[in-house]
């Protein structure tokens, strides 16, 4: 989740009293949470990065409620030049940039810096794919160069840390956090001005020379990265912030660019889609008029033009979340109002019957509850703790958050994370989960039973496993010693039923407990329910 904060009085002072109620109502349309305190807290799902700042959110709300038209504005050409050195192609090859000119940034400075960091975390994947530098153009002199420089060069960072770039990488907080994104080399990427002054060392830190202040009116924004599309997305998100704040955007002349090209950037803005009204009606379950579709899409920030039986829809560049017609229809329904969608009774063509697999899962659930355990549910998508030994083979290609970047391949790590989040509860903690995982590309349903107690060892889970199997299966079980990821060697093993492997059992290693911030002993067993059912039948 992405959180945006602003003092309520500051919001009212800048945008007027009506904007407060406007944003509160807009939450029901978009689907964000709005916490009404002295400091307003707005919490978003990660699917609308164009709204993750107060100026862009206010702009979208005004378009929706005041029917302010979207202008298909074109970027102007700037006389500023940026030369791209061939050396950066091996380190951080992609570059885009723009110039923004307008009023003094004033109180929006904090909004801008917060939005920059949000883009770093979301689109930029913690600066791995994209990093952004924002500079006061009046404090420097173009043309600029995106090139490489020696780590022995000296610089002064935006917060007055002074030393060699090597010092910055090793001692400055930003350097220590992000130096791993650069290859082990004697040179680093840098953006220099006409006189060789260092504007920034991407993706690490900006120099003090072009530090932005509330009085700044002219900005030069550099966007560098490892992924061309991500650089393009960040370009439009930042450009939208400035345009929402009444700034003019112009594009510098890029020499030697490795992409995205100027044409790629311009073509992404107001990209066209043909939306058939029958297609909309099929999703809505009711007939809609061309006028209705156009009105509601314009309220959601699209350019929509008649062309019966199709509507021509042009998607602004900052709507990086829109990947096809279904996304456009979803926005139409949000504007149309989900409460206005007519309910219909769909008569089933068959007679229902219980799913046998689900019935057996219920029996398993009853048995484990009877053994004194509480059921929990964790996310199928995960990522944070799968740095080693990941066997799922299913990763999200473009995750909104690295914490939800893979489909889990086991349950016990998720349960450890859950226990770590509930340390305030008294011991013992006896929990279980029945859930889907993917192992080596195959979907399986697992049962994981876990005990946290000051005396919990593998023998604890072994006795629980024995009791469980006796209540559910008459077949002979056996545990064969095996090293299990995250467990103590010699206190973990593989579970066999009638000679066939059905799961694993183990006592969690102290180092694993430490990684999760846990201190008490934990043991568990995890079995494949399908294998258990096959033995049961």
UniProtKB/Swiss-Prot annotation:
Pfam families: B5, tRNA_synthFbeta
SUPFAM superfamilies in UniProt: Class II aaRS and biotin synthetases, Putative DNA-binding domain
Name of the protein this chain belongs to: Phenylalanine--tRNA ligase beta subunit
GO cellular component: phenylalanine-tRNA ligase complex
Cofactors that this protein relies on: Mg(2+)
HAMAP family found in the cross-reference section: Phe_tRNA_synth_beta2
Record: residues binding Mg(2+): 321, 327, 330-331
Top-level taxonomy: Archaea, Methanobacteriati, Thermoplasmatota, Thermoplasmata, Thermoplasmatales
Family statement: Belongs to the phenylalanyl-tRNA synthetase beta subunit family. Type 2 subfamily.
Complex and partners: Tetramer of two alpha and two beta subunits.
Superkingdom of the source species: Archaea
Known catalytic reactions: tRNA(Phe) + L-phenylalanine + ATP = L-phenylalanyl-tRNA(Phe) + AMP + diphosphate + H(+)
EC number in record: 6.1.1.20
Residue ranges of domain B5 in the record: 268-343
GO molecular function terms listed in the Swiss-Prot or TrEMBL record: ATP binding; magnesium ion binding; phenylalanine-tRNA ligase activity; RNA binding
Organism: Thermoplasma volcanium (strain ATCC 51530 / DSM 4299 / JCM 9571 / NBRC 15438 / GSS1)
A single BP term in Gene Ontology: phenylalanyl-tRNA aminoacylation
Transmembrane segments: none
Subcellular location: Cytoplasm
Gene3D superfamilies associated with the record: 3.30.56.10, Bira Bifunctional Protein, Domain 2, Phenylalanyl-trna Synthetase, Chain B, domain 3
């Amino acid at each position: 989740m992405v959180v945006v904060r602003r003092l309520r009085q500051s919001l009212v002072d800048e945008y007027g009293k009506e904007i407060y109620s406007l944003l509160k109502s807009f939450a029901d349309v978009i689907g964000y949470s709005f916490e009404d305190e002295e400091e307003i807290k707005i919490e978003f799902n990660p699917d609308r990065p164009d709204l993750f700042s107060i100026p862009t959110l206010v702009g979208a709300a005004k378009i929706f409620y005041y029917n302010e038209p979207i202008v298909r504005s074109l970027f102007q050409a700037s006389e500023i030049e940026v030369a791209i050195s061939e050396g950066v192609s091996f380190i951080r090859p992609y570059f885009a940039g723009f110039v923004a000119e307008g009023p003094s940034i004033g109180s929006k400075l904090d909004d801008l810096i917060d939005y920059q960091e949000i883009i770093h975390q979301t689109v930029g994947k913690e600066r791995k794919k994209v990093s952004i530098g924002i500079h006061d153009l009046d404090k420097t002199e173009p043309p600029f160069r995106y090139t490489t420089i020696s780590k022995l060069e000296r610089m002064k960072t935006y917060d007055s840390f002074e030393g060699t770039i090597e010092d910055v990488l090793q001692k400055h907080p930003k350097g220590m956090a992000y130096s791993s994104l650069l290859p082990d080399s004697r040179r680093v990427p840098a953006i220099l001005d006409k006189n060789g002054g260092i504007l920034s060392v991407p993706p690490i830190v900006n120099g003090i020379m072009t530090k932005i202040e509330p009085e700044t009116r002219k900005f030069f924004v550099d966007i560098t990265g490892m992924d061309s599309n991500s650089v393009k997305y960040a370009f439009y998100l930042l450009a939208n912030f400035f345009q929402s704040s009444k700034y003019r955007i112009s594009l510098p002349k890029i020499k030697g660019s490795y992409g995205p090209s100027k044409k790629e950037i311009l073509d992404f803005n107001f990209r066209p889609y043909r939306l058939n009204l029958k297609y909309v009606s099929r999703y809505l379950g009711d007939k809609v008029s061309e006028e209705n579709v156009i009105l509601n899409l314009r309220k959601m920030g699209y350019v929509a033009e008649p062309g019966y039986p199709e509507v021509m829809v042009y998607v602004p560049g900052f709507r990086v979340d829109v990947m096809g017609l279904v996304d456009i229809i979803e926005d139409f329904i949000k504007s149309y109002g989900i409460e206005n969608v007519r309910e219909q009774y769909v008569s089933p063509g068959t007679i229902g019957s219980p799913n046998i697999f689900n019935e057996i899962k219920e029996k398993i659930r009853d048995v484990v509850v009877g053994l004194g355990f509480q059921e929990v549910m964790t996310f199928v998508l995960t990522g944070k703790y799968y740095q080693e030994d990941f066997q799922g083979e299913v990763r999200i290609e473009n995750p909104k958050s690295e914490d939800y970047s893979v489909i889990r391949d086991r349950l016990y790590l998720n349960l450890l994370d859950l226990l770590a989040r509930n340390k305030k509860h008294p011991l013992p903690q006896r929990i279980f989960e029945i859930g889907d995982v993917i192992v080596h590309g195959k979907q399986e349903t697992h049962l994981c039973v876990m005990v946290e107690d000051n005396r919990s060892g593998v023998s604890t889970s072994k006795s629980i496993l024995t009791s469980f199997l006796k209540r559910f299966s008459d077949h002979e079980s056996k545990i064969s010693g095996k090293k299990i990821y995250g467990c103590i060697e010699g206190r973990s093993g593989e579970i066999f039923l009638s000679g066939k492997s059905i799961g694993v059992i183990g006592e969690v290693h102290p180092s694993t407990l430490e990684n999760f911030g846990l201190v008490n002993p934990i043991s568990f067993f995890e079995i494949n329910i399908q294998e258990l059912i096959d033995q049961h039948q």
